[in-house]
């Protein structure tokens, strides 16, 4: 029952989270900082109450290590959300972030001196080609859609390039954080709920530097049209409703992934997360009518096939199916 519940939470939480994020970004493209702050604050308060036991429970991993991890996590979160301000469409944002495998492999080779099989290198090549196709076609759309003047078109393209640079930086930083996390867990053991709390609580003072931008967008949110929440009858500005739902759905998504990792094999987790990304992408394209050409579909297909190849899904599924047959023969 718990694995089925976890899968339901991941699909319901993560997919709807993307929807509310896009609703926010479409109305106010620069709202990344207030969204990040609200998400961090909610998870930090929840963790302080239920994980840290109101601050009475000492951390299993020393705070100095969390400080390093938090710096990376805070940077990745802010940069990823800020990239939406830089002419980056939500579908490209999702596809580009699927390139985490490439970043993990590159840094794994450089830092951990890892070596991989030809099969894995082939899968990474597929992911790279897929991301390149989607990025290249998106670049053409940015320049063609900016038809006001040559200067406007060039300016839009420059902002888009900065957005691609921001996503690339966040991708590499996220991979580096994953390697650092891996070494910490080997040394101190896995404490994922504790890490979730400290990764969101410790960066909160850093939002002081973004306070002006957060306040400006809070004012803009207050000026948005009023919306009555169905069934409750409470009326509030619709942008605050979108933000509230974004926070709740992100929490549901995170909890679903956590339950999934504790209840299911890594193969199941990989399959569910990969399928969830694909469903989110399809919904974003169809519901929000984001421009998506045949080339984008081809690039997306390359990314997801490469991801499944890298995680050796087909090999593992074949092994899983053959095991019951062997057991039956023994009996």
UniProtKB/Swiss-Prot annotation:
List the Pfam families: UAA (PF08449)
Entry's Gene Ontology molecular function annotations: UDP-N-acetylglucosamine transmembrane transporter activity; UDP-xylose transmembrane transporter activity
Q: Where is this motif: Mediates endoplasmic reticulum retention?
A: 326-331
Q: Its topology with respect to the membrane?
A: Multi-pass membrane protein
Q: What are the protein's UniProt keywords?
A: Endoplasmic reticulum, Membrane, Sugar transport, Transmembrane, Transmembrane helix, Transport
What's the catalysed reaction? UDP-N-acetyl-alpha-D-glucosamine(in) + UDP-alpha-D-glucuronate(out) = UDP-N-acetyl-alpha-D-glucosamine(out) + UDP-alpha-D-glucuronate(in); UDP-alpha-D-xylose(in) + UDP-alpha-D-glucuronate(out) = UDP-alpha-D-xylose(out) + UDP-alpha-D-glucuronate(in)
Q: Where in the cell is it found?
A: Endoplasmic reticulum membrane
The record's principal subcellular location, in a coarse class, is: endoplasmic reticulum
Spell out where the chain crosses the membrane. Answer: 4-24, 30-50, 59-79, 92-112, 117-137, 153-173, 201-221, 229-249, 251-267, 268-288, 291-311
Q: Does the keyword Magnesium apply?
A: no
Q: Which GO terms describe its cellular component?
A: endoplasmic reticulum membrane; Golgi membrane
* Entries under InterPro entries matching the protein: SCL35B1-4/HUT1
Please report which protein family the annotation says this sequence is part of. Belongs to the nucleotide-sugar transporter family. SLC35B subfamily.
Q: What does this protein do?
A: Antiporter that transports nucleotide sugars across the endoplasmic reticulum (ER) membrane in exchange for another nucleotide sugar. May couple UDP-alpha-D-glucuronate (UDP-GlcA) or UDP-alpha-D-xylose (UDP-Xyl) efflux to UDP-alpha-D-glucuronate (UDP-GlcA) influx into the ER lumen, which in turn stimulates glucuronidation and excretion of endobiotics and xenobiotics.
Q: Kindly provide the name given to this protein in its UniProt entry.
A: Nucleotide sugar transporter SLC35B4
Organism encoding this protein: Macaca fascicularis
The gene designation is SLC35B4
């Amino acid at each position: 029952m718990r694995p089925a519940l976890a899968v339901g939470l991941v699909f319901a939480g993560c997919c709807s989270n993307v929807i509310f994020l896009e609703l926010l970004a479409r109305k106010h493209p620069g709202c990344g900082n207030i969204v990040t702050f609200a998400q961090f604050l909610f998870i930090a308060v929840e963790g302080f109450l239920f994980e840290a036991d109101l601050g009475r429970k000492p951390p299993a991993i020393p705070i100095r290590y969390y400080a390093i991890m938090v710096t990376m996590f805070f940077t990745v979160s802010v940069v990823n959300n800020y990239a939406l301000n830089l002419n980056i469409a939500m579908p490209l944002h999702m596809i580009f972030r699927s390139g985490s495998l490439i970043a993990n492999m590159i840094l794994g080779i450089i830092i951990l001196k890892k070596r991989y099989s030809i099969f894995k290198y082939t899968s990474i090549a597929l992911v790279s080609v897929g991301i390149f196709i989607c990025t290249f076609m998106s670049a053409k759309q940015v320049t063609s859609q900016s038809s006001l003047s040559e200067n406007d078109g060039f300016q839009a393209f420059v902002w888009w390039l900065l957005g691609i640079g921001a996503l690339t930086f966040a991708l590499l930083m996220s991979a580096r954080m994953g390697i650092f996390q891996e070494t910490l867990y080997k040394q101190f053991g896995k404490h994922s709920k504790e890490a979730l709390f400290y990764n969101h609580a410790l960066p909160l003072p850093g939002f002081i530097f973004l306070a002006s931008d957060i306040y400006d967008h809070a004012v803009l949110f207050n000026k948005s049209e009023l919306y009555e929440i169905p069934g409750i009858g409470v009326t509030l500005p619709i942008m605050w409703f979108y933000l509230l739902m974004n926070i709740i759905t992100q929490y549901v998504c995170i909890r679903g992934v956590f339950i999934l990792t504790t209840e299911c094999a890594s193969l199941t987790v990989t399959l569910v997360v990969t399928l969830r990304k694909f469903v989110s992408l399809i919904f974003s394209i169809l519901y929000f009518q984001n421009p998506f050409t045949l080339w984008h579909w081809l690039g997306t297909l390359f990314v997801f096939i490469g991801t499944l190849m890298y995680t050796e899904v087909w090999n593992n599924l074949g092994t899983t199916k053959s095991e019951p047959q062997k057991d039956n023969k023994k009996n």
